[in-house]
Amino acid sequence: MSNVDINHARALVYQLLSSLFAREIDEQRLKQLTSEQAQLFWTQLGYASEFSAPVANIQKVLNGLTSDEALLELAADYCGLFLVGTKHSASPYASLYLSPEEEPLLFGQQHQQMSEFLHQSQLQVQSHFPEPADHLAVILAYMGHLTCHSEDAAQLSFLNACIDSWLAKFVAKVVECDSKHSNGFYSALATLTLAWVQQDKQQLEQAIN
């Protein structure tokens, strides 16, 4: 594969992970995620040993969503984990993990920083996604953009400062809170995201050095 092909594949993974943290899975999205093309994508991603377990869990849950009730239960899991904002949830905002304040404000420093990154790239958070710019979905989507539009050093700098600096804490919180739910979809998604970011970071470091 050429560097262009590799970066395109990396962008696809970041965009996929971003989309799954951005909103609940509805019937239309489920069809996309379980299509023949998507199944091939999941299988290829799962070939890597560090991704195989979470990918298998994700595929198992997606292929088992065969009723409206099951979809609603997964949507409730998403809401309980990411939208409620209690001690039993895992808020997906960087500021809550990076701010030294005991009760950091949304739309704070990390939001402003990400907004500036987006502005510099002539991008913005879409109007139908009314969340602070330091939401994990926005950050992962921006990293996907960088893979095809920035040098390796700039990608690594952003990854270290804006993702790797807090992702492990967030993932640990997701796993802790999601353990109450039977299918563990979001635990698997979070675990996959961390493994992917760690591998991508390692490959960027090797490419630079």
Swiss-Prot record:
Keyword Ribonucleoprotein tagged: no
Compartments reported by the entry: Cytoplasm
Xref: Pfam families: Nitrate_red_del
Family matches, as InterPro entries: Chaperone_TorD, DMSO/NO3_reduct_chaperone, HscB_C_sf, TorD-like_sf, TorD/DmsD_chaperones
A GO BP annotation: protein folding
Keywords linked to the UniProt accession: Chaperone, Cytoplasm
SUPFAM superfamilies per the UniProt record, alphabetical: TorD-like
GO CC term, one of those recorded: cytoplasm
Domain of life assignment: Bacteria
Keyword Chaperone: yes
Gene3D superfamilies documented for this protein: 1.20.120.1820, HscB, C-terminal domain
PANTHER family found in the cross-reference section: CHAPERONE PROTEIN TORD, CHAPERONE PROTEIN YCDY
Function: Involved in the biogenesis of TorA. Acts on TorA before the insertion of the molybdenum cofactor and, as a result, probably favors a conformation of the apoenzyme that is competent for acquiring the cofactor.
Similarity comment: Belongs to the TorD/DmsD family. TorD subfamily.
Entry protein name: Chaperone protein TorD
Lineage: Bacteria, Pseudomonadati, Pseudomonadota, Gammaproteobacteria, Alteromonadales
